[in-house]
Structures are given as C-alpha cells and as structure tokens.
Design a protein with these regions (language model features):
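Nucleotide and nucleotide-moiety/phosphate-recognizing core
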Residues: 2-113, 124, 128, 133, ...
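Short glycine-enriched, charge-decorated loop/helix-capping segments at active-site entrances
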Residues: 110-116, 153-157
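Hydrophobic alpha-helical segments within soluble ligand-binding/sensing domains
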Residues: 119-122
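Extracellular serine-dependent O-acyl
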Residues: 139
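The feature captures the short pre-catalytic strand/loop hairpin that immediately precedes
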Residues: 144-156
Length: 199
C-alpha cells in the first residue's frame, strides 16, 4: 500500500552486511543500532521487502519503518531506492541513515544533513540513487593504524564491548529525538561533540 496524501512516514535505515559472519562486526553498527531501537520499542515482527528486513511502528501518528538492506553493504542503494520510490519519499525529510565511520573515534557520533560518502561504500551506493541530501548518523568505530578492511570487518574487542550498550543508548536517544523534535540544529548541537570518557 503506497503512501496516502498527508500520511507521514519516516525510514530509519541501518547499514550492514547480512549473515551470521558479519553480525557482530564494527561495519554492522547500523544493523546493531536498528535492532537495539526495535528491542527498546518492543518490535518483534520483521519481514522481507524491498531487498531488506523491514519492521514498523506508529509513533505520534507517524509511521516509522526500520530498514536493514540485505544486498550487502556496497549495494545498499539498490534497496533504499525501492522503498523511496514505493512510498514517494523525500530523502531530505523522510530518511535517517545510521552507519559506521572510521574517521571518528570509537563512541563518537556525528549527525549530518547532507554530504559526500566519506569513502563509505554503503553511503556511496545510496548517494548514487537518491543524491547527497539525507540525514545520516555516523557512528565512530575508530581505525588507528590497522588495515581498514580488517578493522571494519573485525568484531568489537572486549574494551569496546563494555562501552557498546552505552553508545547504542546514545544512538537510540538521538533517533527518538529526531522522530519527535523538528529542530535538527538543536539535536546536532547536543550530539555532535566528542564523547566524555565512558565510565
């Protein structure tokens, strides 16, 4: 069923790679964050549609769709364009994308309204289909001096695991505020700062 006139829809997209092999890797922080949101909201049902795993919930009269492309990271845009076209979405207003960023320290998040891919292949794929103007939440996974591919496809180490719940809670709160508060500038000011030392 396509979007009805005046019906508000928001899509919260988490990027990652499908399959057990990747589910606990740093590159899958987008999937992990979306699953955490679904858990907090008691959303258990998930179905396959638009080459993605999809679930939804009505929040304050707005349909919110939680969306995990199953195309593998580099083809994420193929999945995203399907739901954008189906619901006739405006990417600038209706989409939030959560993904990993090696250029940010572990635990930092940055909100952006638009921009380039920054070398992230999932974002590059999405941009190729819908352009650069969509809100994204970049989640820092650090990189240090490690090989980039080895780092992003590696699992969180013990130190990172200890902090992960707190970081996911921060992402969760950020998304909830985005869905309920219209003042994105205020939200960006709140979250776009380096994390304090985690306890």
């Amino acid at each position: 069923m396509k979007r009805k006139e005046g019906k508000k829809i928001k899509i919260v997209i988490g990027l990652g790679n499908p399959g057990k092999k990747y589910e606990k890797t740093r590159h899958n922080i987008g999937f992990i964050a979306v699953d955490n949101l679904r858990k907090k909201m008691n959303i258990s049902d998930e179905r396959e549609k638009f080459q993605a795993l999809v679930s939804e919930k009505n929040i304050d009269g707005e349909k919110v769709i939680f969306f995990k492309p199953q195309t593998f990271m580099n083809l994420s845009g193929n999945s995203v364009i399907e739901i954008v076209n189906f619901y006739k979405l405006d990417p600038k207003k209706d989409i939030i994308v959560i993904y990993d960023d090696m250029d940010l320290s572990f635990g930092d998040i940055r909100i952006r309204e638009k921009g380039s891919s920054g070398g992230h292949n999932g974002i590059k794929s999405i941009i190729s289909h819908i352009g650069e103007e969509f809100i994204r939440i970049k989640c820092g996974i650090g990189a240090k001096e490690k090989d980039a591919v080895e780092h992003v496809l590696g699992e969180f180490n013990q130190t990172e695991q200890k902090d992960l719940d707190e970081i996911l809670e921060k992402i969760n709160n950020c998304v909830i505020e985005m869905l309920s508060v219209q003042n994105l500038d205020r939200i960006m000011q709140k979250y776009n700062k380096k994390k304090e030392k985690l306890k």
